[in-house]
């Protein structure tokens, strides 16, 4: 995924696009980066645990430069992180997307460590295709484990940002190999709001799916689908208003006016958390909801991380941030997310980080 609409000009042969959030820098007093490893905001302790990727960390897998990192718990108990456009050893070399890494880390507070990759010693592209005119790149939006299979939802670009369709790929071996399910979500459907997805399984045995436009230019809509129909788009039931009342089966109605970028919808017991990158406001927000159908306007937002400039970073203010993927093993009281950062001026930072949030269970979510 590309923060602020930047394209990879050298790779795609297109002109660089302007940033979304240059004028949206977060306000407030910034602490020096070295002043503290954590900060408390409204009773929530925010900590940067570590860099998860980078040449000296994941270069041994051929993943020197990666972003995103949506993640699921595999059937065998490991976590599988799925990354977007990936390069190595040098920037722009050996372009692959999506790629993956496994982690057996159980104590997230100690920091996630990776111990393997689909492909053996060198990370392979999970979906077989050539980066070219027909398909420039395929970007992952989320993964989910249902029974003994993993389902990967990904966005197919014909020129970055020109989404021709999104699809679902399936793995029956913990992410080592993947098969195209044949599911196709048209890029223009629902005013492009069926492109980028996040999902989780409810206690009622429905998978709830938030979707929005890939280029962070739309609000989100909601569908639900039975797990056994997850690869059949025609079985997805939209949530919308009919005669002024919300119901399943109506044309999908946007849930709020917020612009939803990369996001993560996850259930914790009887509650749901939704984390997302808000491009226009240049920050990562979250909400705790009673159910995915809850009107987001009835719940308060918590800003997890603010955007800022490169010379004003501190614990919870990051330059050119994006992503926001909940890491399995988290709890509402101790939430960990994967966050991306890309310095588009020189590519010196293009990596994924782990952030920890303690106390979201005690936060007052009432609007």
Q: Could you tell me what each predicted segment is?
A:
Residues 11, 190-192:
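Short, surface-exposed linear segments at secondary-structure transitions and domain or protein termini
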Residues 1-10, 15-34:
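N-terminal secretory signal peptides
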Residues 8-12, 105, 222, 265, ...:
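Generic low-polarity alpha-helical segments
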Residues 25, 29, 63, 81, ...:
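Generic detector of bulky aromatic hydrophobic side chains
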Residues 36-64, 73-134, 145-190, 203-260, ...:
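Beta-rich carbohydrate-recognition and catalytic domains
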Residues 67-70, 135-142, 194-199, 261-264, ...:
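Beta-propeller and closely related beta-sheet repeat lectin domains
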């Amino acid at each position: 995924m590309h923060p602020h609409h930047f394209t990879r000009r050298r790779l795609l042969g297109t002109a660089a696009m302007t940033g979304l959030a240059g004028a949206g820098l977060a306000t407030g007093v910034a602490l020096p980066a070295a002043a503290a490893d954590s900060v408390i905001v409204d009773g929530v302790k925010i900590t940067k645990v570590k860099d998860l990727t980078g040449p000296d960390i994941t270069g041994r897998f051929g993943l020197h430069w990666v972003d995103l990192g949506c993640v699921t718990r595999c059937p065998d108990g490991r976590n599988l992180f799925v990354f977007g456009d990936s390069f190595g050893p040098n920037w722009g070399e050996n372009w692959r997307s999506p790629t993956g890494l496994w982690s057996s880390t159980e104590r997230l507070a100690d920091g996630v460590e990776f111990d393997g990759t689909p492909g053996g010693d060198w990370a392979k592209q999970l979906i077989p295709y050539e980066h070219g005119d027909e398909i420039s790149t395929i970007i992952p939006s989320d993964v989910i484990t249902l029974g003994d299979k993993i389902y990967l939802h990904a966005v197919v670009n014909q020129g970055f940002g020109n989404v021709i369709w999104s699809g679902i790929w399936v793995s029956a071996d913990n992410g080592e190999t993947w098969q195209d399910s044949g599911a196709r979500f048209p890029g223009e459907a629902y005013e492009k709001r069926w492109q980028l997805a996040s999902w989780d399984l409810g206690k009622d045995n429905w998978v709830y799916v938030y979707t929005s436009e890939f280029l962070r230019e739309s609000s989100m809509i909601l569908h639900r689908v039975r797990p056994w129909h997850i690869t059949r788009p025609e079985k997805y039931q939209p949530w919308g208003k009919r005669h002024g009342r919300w119901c399943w089966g109506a044309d999908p109605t946007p849930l709020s006016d917020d612009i939803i970028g990369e996001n993560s919808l996850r259930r914790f017991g009887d509650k749901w958390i939704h984390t997302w990158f808000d491009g226009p406001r240049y920050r990562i927000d979250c909400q705790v909801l009673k159910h995915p159908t809850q009107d987001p306007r009835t719940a308060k937002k918590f800003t997890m991380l603010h955007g800022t400039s490169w010379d004003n970073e501190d614990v919870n203010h990051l330059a050119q941030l994006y992503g926001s993927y909940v890491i399995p093993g988290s709890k509402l009281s101790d939430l960990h997310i994967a966050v991306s950062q890309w310095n588009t001026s020189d590519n010196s930072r293009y990596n994924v980080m782990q952030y920890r949030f303690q106390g979201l269970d005690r936060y007052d979510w009432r609007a």
